């Protein structure tokens, strides 16, 4: 297989992995934690998984010492927690 074909295959596999939903049985336990602003006084948008709505939602993150249900991007939250 040519290097171009391998790159195409790798790209397609990566896309498939990104789009494959996480089943609730495979979802990490920390996805059930409530949003945690943390103890610092920063002000930046982050995302957390809301299990009752089964989706990722924005919240304001203080910048440090929060629980692991805290993602920089919506895509990262969906990939990790959303079913």
Curated annotation (Swiss-Prot):
UniProt xrefs under PROSITE patterns: BPTI_KUNITZ_1 (PS00280), BPTI_KUNITZ_2 (PS50279)
InterPro entries: Kunitz_BPTI (IPR002223), Kunitz_BPTI_sf (IPR036880), Prtase_inh_Kunz-CS (IPR020901), TFPI/VKTCI-like (IPR050098)
Cellular-component GO terms for this entry: extracellular space
Tissue/organ expression: Expressed by the venom gland.
Signal sequence segment: 1-24
Keyword annotations of the record: Disulfide bond, Protease inhibitor, Secreted, Serine protease inhibitor, Signal
The keyword rRNA-binding is assigned to this record: no
Pfam families per record: Kunitz_BPTI
Annotated positions for site Reactive bond for chymotrypsin: 41-42
Function description: Serine protease inhibitor.
Name used for this protein in its record: Kunitz-type serine protease inhibitor vestiginin-2
